[in-house]
Amino acid sequence: MKNFVSMHAILLACSAGAGLAAITQGISEGTYSRIVEMATISQAAYANLCNIPSTITSAGKIYNAETDINGWVLRDDSRQEIITVFRGTGSDTNLQLDTNYTQAPFDTLPQCSGCAVHGGYYVGWISVKDQVEGLVQQQASQYPDYSLVITGHSLGASMAAITAAQLSATYNNITVYTFGEPRTGNQAYASYVDETFQATNPDATKFYRVTHTNDGIPNLPPTSQGYVHHGTEYWSVEPHGPQNMYLCLGDEVQCCEAQGGQGVNDAHVTYFGMASGACTW
């Protein structure tokens, strides 16, 4: 028995409270396929990009020894995309970043007025900012017609979100896919992401915040410390498929965050049947 409540119970709760409009069942086959493809790349980042599609090549490595932030800038010529992917937590050094909940002003993005982000992840961002911006600019200059895609899982998801917000000041063709993303910033930051990427409009969004059953990491850091999720949540329940994806508006509706998951659990490390770094897909 899965450790999350049935959708029937969820829909009943919503009809009695916030209303059925808060949750929509099902997404298109194309959107689902794209989400799974990005999950594959994000999970492969734990194992040096094992088993990623053959159309994707590496344009450069992202790495900082002090923070152990790892990632790559990739290029998919078949789709005309420049893809930035960040690895999730893979070391005690990363864990220290994870648990630094002190919010930091988002000073590198002055356009984001009043914005504050997760202190540990901001330290991570500062440590690789020049690398990321340099590699992306290099590729964007060589391939000006290519769009940008940014993705990651767990810590890598928050890194992807912060990176996307930062790069949005320079580029306007960014799409973001995050998996098991912790809460990454305050209300001002969440509102900035929502507006920039139309994250609350499923018909136009450029930001897909994907969760899985009772993944415990999206419950962290707690809202009591001023953290708020951005945008529409794309909640995946089992068995996996486009009709078992639910679009959940807002931060605290009855989807992933309401399922009682705590911290790193099975639902966090496995997305769409792919375990982080397992390379068995």
Curated annotation (Swiss-Prot):
Protein family according to the UniProt entry: Belongs to the AB hydrolase superfamily. FaeA family.
Gene responsible for this protein: faeA
Disulfide bridge positions per record: 50-279, 112-115, 248-255
Keyword rRNA-binding on entry: no
Gene3D superfamilies: alpha/beta hydrolase
Keyword Signal appears in the UniProt entry: yes
Chief subcellular location: secreted
Keywords: Carbohydrate metabolism, Disulfide bond, Glycoprotein, Hydrolase, Polysaccharide degradation, Secreted, Serine esterase, Signal, Xylan degradation
UniProt name for this protein: Probable feruloyl esterase A
Known EC number: 3.1.1.73
Enzyme superclass (EC): hydrolase
Lineage, uppermost ranks: Eukaryota, Fungi, Dikarya, Ascomycota, Pezizomycotina
